[in-house]
Design a protein with these regions (language model features):
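Single, functionally critical "micro-switch" positions that shape active/binding sites
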Residues: 12, 16, 40
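C-terminal, non-catalytic "cap/extension" segments appended to globular domains
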Residues: 11, 19, 46, 57, ...
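Short pre-active-site segment immediately N-terminal to the catalytic Zn-binding motif
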Residues: 1-12
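Acidic/His metal-coordination segments adjacent to aromatic residues that form catalytic metal sites
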Residues: 1, 24-35, 61-68, 129-137
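Post-HExxH zinc-binding segment in Zn-dependent metallohydrolases
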Residues: 24, 34-62, 70-71, 76, ...
Length: 179
């Protein structure tokens, strides 16, 4: 933790994983205690949204700004996540691609999915090197799309919470108990 609003995001995200693990720990089917990778991020990303009502306690009069920035970031993440998945398919379909060709593949993904992105004077990123920042592509190939799918599920919990917070929390707890 470093004293920024990111601490709250990371904390609520990781607590979502922990709460899910605790909630399903009594399940006799070991495969149901921990969800598959494609489902695991739903619990954590959803809790980020479901804790919006408590953000006043962290941020006081800046809570609305936090919520807006978090939501904007979540929305902006969707095309980035899709671009990353598409890029990985291109890389694996072209295993002999040179570094320059991989950079060009990434630039084409940025142009397709994030057409307003402008790296300005950040040369390496502008030349297509930004994909190398994402460690998931190296350590857990094809996992990043799971974050994207989970984000859409989490946004559904946010919308449900906007309508009826108690009902949304009940649905969330029920989901966590399923593993």
């Amino acid at each position: 933790f470093n004293g920024t609003d990111g601490d709250v995001r990371v904390f609520t995200h990781e607590i979502g994983h922990a709460f899910q693990g605790f909630s399903s720990s009594d399940d006799r089917l070991l495969d149901c205690v921990w969800p598959s990778y494609d489902a695991a991020e739903i619990h954590s990303m959803s809790l980020e949204f479901l804790t919006y009502p408590q953000m006043d306690k962290f941020f006081g009069h800046e809570a609305d700004a936090f919520r807006w920035n978090h939501l904007a970031g979540a929305l902006a993440f969707l095309p980035y996540g899709v671009a990353g998945d598409h890029f990985q398919h291109l890389v694996y379909d072209n295993p002999k691609a040179t570094p320059a060709e991989r950079h060009e593949m990434w630039r084409s993904m940025e142009a397709k999915y994030m057409p307003d992105l402008d790296w300005g004077d950040i040369g390496y990123a502008a030349k297509g090197g930004r994909w190398q920042f994402q460690g998931h592509y190296f350590g857990m190939p094809f996992y990043y799309i799971d974050y994207t799918l989970a984000q859409t599920c989490a946004m559904q919990f946010w919308l449900a919470c906007e309508e009826d917070q108690a009902a949304a929390l009940e649905r969330y707890v029920a989901l966590c108990k399923l593993g």
